[in-house]
Amino acid sequence: MRIIAGEWRGRPLVAPKGDATRPTADRTREALFSMLASRLGSFEGLAVADLFAGSGALGLEALSRGAASCLFVEQDRAALDALRANIAALRTSAAEVRAGSVMALGPTPQPLDLIMMDPPYGTGAGAVPSTSSAGSAGLVPQPGSRLRLPSRRMWS
């Protein structure tokens, strides 16, 4: 697993040990970010959230491509260890990690431009269908912001 593009292109990422989390494959991330780039134009200056962050691959990809900040939310201990190791290896101060449930997040420090969720399969955790619903979890989306949920159907 690696960063696909941007400042940290090609840098390896560690994944959590065990099978509690399944990191988003490089090809899936590449397709997702290609779609986002075609809609957003640029990631420059965006405030991003990576919910159910796991290793942080989605948020770190956004930071590598120019996002100003990323809020990572994860509750699995092994995933948090991998996430923190990846952030430390990239030496970025643009990352904020919150340990705990996405639904108990509380207010975000700033309005968000892009909210990405890649929840574990079969948990029903990806049932947040819009940015207005995300607001009920404490997220503060910017007007016109986007919520992206990779799904099994999208990539099969």
Task: Annotate each PLM feature.
Residues 1-156:
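Class I S-adenosyl-L-methionine-dependent methyltransferase catalytic core
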